[in-house]
């Protein structure tokens, strides 16, 4: 899919940016720090036009996992050592695939709440657009969970960092108006008052429950939002 990219205007810069995105550069600032800011906007726009990368807020992600894997293993290795032989390339690629598979298996063996905690622990001041809202994901010092009073209520999450407190309700069961109301009550017990209240569910929310959450100024993260974040932070 990258064939001919380097021959286009700003294509060389675009290819450099793409390689660094594949190797963990998530934000425009981070990409610029690695390759310089000259003609960076045009290079990144070319990646969007060629459907090689997508932008969300200040973050960039290669949505095709095969392309991302190829760039970070085969392509990067060939560029650093043009004389490397095919068996070595194949071995490195296979080891990378096995490592990704192991990571995926370990992640899916964890509870949904633990996966969300791991996600929060990776935030580092990136700006993203989720649920028709743009917001910054602070770097948190601590992320802890708390069990609600009822067994069916999922898990509450409290994240602290940069003088901010975020609270989230992490749900695997269907969310209704009462679930939102109990979470709002929990948030009112927090000191300092949470600067963000988030409803996180691995199933689509009922429209009425979503309206109630938005009326309480809560950020709603549904499955598509979580998939985007997991991809952005290399968990899918």
Give names to the regions the model predicted:
Residues 33-50:
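Short amphipathic alpha-helical interaction segments
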Residues 63, 76-236:
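Mixed-charge (Asp/Glu-Lys/Arg
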Residues 16-19, 69-76, 118:
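Short, hydrophobic/amphipathic alpha-helical patches that form generic packing surfaces
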Residues 1-37, 84-85:
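Winged-helix-like regulatory helical subdomains adjacent to P-loop NTPase cores
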């Amino acid at each position: 899919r990258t064939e001919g990219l380097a021959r286009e205007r700003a294509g060389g810069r675009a290819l450099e940016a793409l390689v660094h995105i594949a190797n963990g550069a998530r934000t425009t600032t981070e990409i610029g720090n690695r390759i310089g800011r000259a003609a960076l906007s045009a290079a990144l726009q070319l990646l969007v036009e060629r459907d090689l990368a997508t932008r969300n807020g200040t973050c960039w992600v290669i949505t095709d996992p095969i392309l991302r894997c190829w760039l970070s293993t085969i392509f990067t290795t060939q560029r650093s050592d043009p004389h490397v032989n095919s068996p070595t390339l194949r071995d490195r690629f296979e080891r990378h695939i096995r490592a990704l598979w192991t990571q995926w298996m370990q992640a899916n063996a964890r509870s949904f709440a633990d996966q969300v905690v791991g996600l929060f622990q990776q935030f580092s001041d990136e700006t993203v657009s989720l649920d028709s809202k743009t917001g910054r994901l602070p770097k948190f010092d601590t992320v802890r969970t708390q069990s609600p009073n009822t067994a069916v209520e999922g898990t509450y999450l409290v994240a602290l960092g940069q003088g901010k407190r975020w609270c989230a309700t992490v749900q695997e069961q269907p969310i209704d108006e009462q679930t939102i109301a109990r979470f709002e009550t929990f948030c009112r017990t927090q000191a300092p008052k949470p600067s963000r209240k988030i409803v996180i569910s691995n199933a689509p929310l009922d429209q009425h429950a979503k309206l109630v959450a938005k009326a309480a100024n809560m950020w709603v993260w549904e499955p598509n939002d979580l998939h985007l974040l997991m991809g952005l932070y290399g968990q899918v």
